[in-house]
């Protein structure tokens, strides 16, 4: 006998998600993930001055706002042929890295850990949370260590927020990211404050998150293979050096290959066959349509279905790790958490290095205003949760009907 289970809304995410499962016995026979909200950022931008875009697209997400802002700016800068000052590149890298670290700590300690421990500590206004413990615990687990670290992680996340606010103007949605550079003027006092925050963050991320993941992996060994998708892994690359080469490389690792390959953007398409969206399907991003159509009988979600060469793909910290040479025995739950924890450590060290390259009392804004005319451009980027892209067409400095955004969540919650 088949049973239908519906979770609506799914909590501990940033968005509107419903999951429906058809279950026979103990086996899930069919599953649907539904984006239940029409976001409409593309039509919202149509006809607007393109310089508004970066601040607007940051509102797509409260967790990966920096990545959307930066990628949106880079798409516009590609149209203008603008090269940002080195000081601005360093500051964008530092701001985005701090956003990655905060998001990884949020994901593990606030969104994931409650499933694996009996309760979390009371910290300030945060109340004790009872947990429905995940199935599969086979080993002993010292929960007190994890509870202590979860409390410390809140302070470290705050340090990340403070760092972003100091260099980006505010948090979330930093206003200091502008076309052609950033607005911050790094004084000696500002530098000293940021460096102190970096030391605080590094003191935690250098070993604690990775150790905590291993504690859980020992207690819940079956989660090593749980969640393996069999899909390929895509990474867009991020944190460029002065020559434009990304610290985290870009590439695609097919499911049946051990070799990282390049790909052509023409291979990326988005289908709306199962989406409550109008237009022919599938379409390349530069031809994309984002208009609601509630009359489609087969539609069950507002999410599109992105494909690379016609196949679904996975994105995120694990994908970045695989593309950059990691070879885990399994690609399940713990591989994903290990990848996030390792990134938190690596990016903390990277921030310390970028700080040594910053110049004191040097402008990070462009010497001359960047002028936007007509043309089309795109940029690919990485958010903490995975790869994203912005494709833009301008007419006389304004967004034309097309301003298409491929987000990491759309890739993760792809429709059929």
Label each residue range with its predicted role.
Residues 1-385, 395, 406-416:
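Active-site bordering "gate/hinge" segments
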Residues 400:
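Catalytic-core signal marking the mid-to-C-terminal active-site face
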């Amino acid at each position: 006998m088949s049973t239908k289970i519906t979770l609506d809304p799914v909590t501990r995410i940033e968005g509107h998600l419903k999951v429906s499962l058809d279950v026979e016995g103990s086996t899930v026979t069919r599953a649907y993930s539904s984006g239940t909200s029409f976001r409409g950022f593309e039509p919202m931008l149509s006809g607007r001055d393109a310089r508004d875009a970066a601040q607007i697209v940051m509102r797509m997400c409260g967790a990966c706002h920096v990545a959307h802002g930066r990628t949106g700016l880079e798409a516009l800068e590609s149209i203008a042929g603008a090269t940002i000052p080195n000081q601005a590149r360093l500051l964008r890298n530092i701001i985005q890295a701090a956003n990655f670290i905060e998001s990884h700590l949020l994901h593990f300690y606030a969104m994931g850990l409650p499933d694996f421990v009996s309760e979390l500590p009371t910290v300030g206004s945060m109340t004790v949370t009872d947990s429905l413990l995940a199935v599969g615990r086979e080993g002993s687990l010292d929960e007190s260590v994890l509870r202590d670290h979860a409390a410390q992680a809140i302070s470290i996340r705050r340090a990340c927020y403070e760092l972003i606010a100091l260099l980006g103007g505010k948090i979330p949605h930093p206003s200091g990211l502008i076309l052609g550079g950033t607005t911050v003027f790094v004084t000696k006092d500002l530098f000293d404050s940021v460096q102190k925050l970096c030391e605080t963050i590094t003191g935690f991320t250098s070993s604690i998150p990775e150790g905590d993941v291993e504690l859980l992996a020992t207690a819940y060994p079956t989660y090593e293979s749980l969640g393996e998708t069999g899909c390929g892994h895509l990474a867009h690359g991020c944190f460029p050096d002065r020559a434009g080469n990304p610290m985290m490389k870009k590439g695609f690792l097919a499911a049946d290959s051990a070799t990282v390959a390049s790909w052509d953007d023409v291979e990326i398409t988005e289908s709306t066959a199962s989406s409550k969206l109008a237009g022919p399907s599938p379409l390349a991003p530069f031809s994309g349509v984002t208009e609601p159509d509630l009359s489609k009988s087969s539609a069950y979600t507002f999410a599109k279905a992105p494909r690379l060469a016609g196949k679904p793909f996975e994105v995120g910290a694990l994908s970045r790790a695989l593309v950059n040479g990691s070879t885990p025995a399994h690609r399940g739950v713990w591989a994903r958490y290990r990848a996030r924890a390792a990134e938190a450590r690596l990016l903390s060290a990277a921030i310390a290095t970028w700080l040594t390259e910053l110049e004191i009392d040097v402008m990070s804004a462009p010497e001359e205003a960047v002028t936007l005319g007509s043309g089309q451009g795109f940029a690919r980027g990485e958010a903490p949760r995975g790869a994203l892209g912005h494709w833009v067409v301008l007419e006389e400095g304004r967004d034309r009907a097309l301003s298409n955004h491929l987000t990491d969540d759309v890739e993760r919650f792809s429709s059929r």
